[in-house]
Amino acid sequence: MFNNKKFIYLLCMSFSLLINIKAQTFSNETFIIETTFGQIKLKLYEETPVHKANFKKLVLNRFFDSLLFHRVINQFMIQGGDQLSKYSNTGDSLGHGDIGYTLTSEINPKLIHKKGALCAAREGDDINPKFESSASQFYIVMGKSRTLEDLKKYEDRINKTHYNNCAREFIKSKQGRALKQQYNRLTNENKLDSAYIINSLIENSTKIEYLKTSEYHFNQKQINLYTTIGGTPHLDNTYTVFGEVTEGIEIIVVYKFICF
């Protein structure tokens, strides 16, 4: 049986070659995660400067030294960066540690959750509708290959998430609060026909906001990647992807065999 503690040491070193590809531009540093099973090498994206600068700062300050991959979900991802994991014991609940600030979302449609993607963890949509990122917790996508039917379901889920966020934002507005209060009052008074009319007004206003942006659909590049090497496509457009594994992807695969 493997020991529960999987140590992570992140070191930054100079890398002389700047690599350019169509989808994204790599920064000129390589970040190395030293694990029990070997090295994982990362490159960060120039398209996400806030996340890149923050990650580099934490590495140089040795924040990640001896932290754990505290969350491992087979065919999904491995997650680390919780400062509470440094001195944790077997069975401790982890994943709630933070460092007092969040990062503005840098979601970019070109940067996707393919296998090996480095992404920022965050709080859920209900309390974080702007998709702000955790400053320290990150995950690396493990994922699996998907079918075209899977991708259609994920498109629907992403669009539903956007619709729900539009609804929450409308209810926070002055007009939305007034309509919601009116709806609640009519419901309590059992005036259901009138309540239905008010609810229709709320839904129509939400749809107007929702339709201000185009519905989300995977492009051909995403389809090709997700149906071959795989990933977690349902997280696209909702979490910030700010880098990727360039060497050592096989180390991530090893973690799927570990039981916590």
Report residues per predicted region.
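Bacterial Sec-dependent N-terminal signal peptides
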Residues: 1-27
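Cyclophilin-like peptidyl-prolyl cis-trans isomerases
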Residues: 21-260
